[in-house]
Amino acid sequence: MTFFSELPGPSGTTVRLLNEQLYSLTVNGRPIAAATLLPEQLEEFAAGYLITEGITAYSEIESIMPDTAVIGVLTVNPFKVLLPRKTVVSGCGGTASYLDPARLPKVPNGDCLSLSGLTPDFPAEILAAGGFTAAAYTQTGRVASASDISQHAAFDKVIGSLLRQG
């Protein structure tokens, strides 16, 4: 997949722009969120977003159908109204946060992995353009990585990728 479009710039130069697109995420036909994303790993983004926002369990997702501007998700019970269960401050929205860092569990030293030699190949052009990459490693050795124009979207794609891998 190409991450960039090349457009004519001033004085005969070429301008490279990330191919970001606005998507509406819907669940059972109801709008849940709008996100500007790179047009790849859209199913992974939808799964990761719905899980991290506490909207539904992965086992409740029946299907994910990305289109040109909408990522539609159907759940096992389409009549159940699903809404986010938490609000976390991000950017300049000015909302309340219910995430208390003091209550988060500590990671035991034995659960930490040495990342020496495990770093996946991140697209250098995404990083150079100010984009973000994310990677996750499981204790069973599964690896997932993703890139996007925001770190939240990259993490949601990684989480969704691991969920879809099983």
Protein language model regions, located:
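Intrinsically disordered, low-complexity regions enriched in acidic/Ser/Thr/Pro/Gln residues
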Residues: 1-134, 139, 144-152, 156, ...
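Acidic, glycine-enriched active-site microenvironments
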Residues: 166
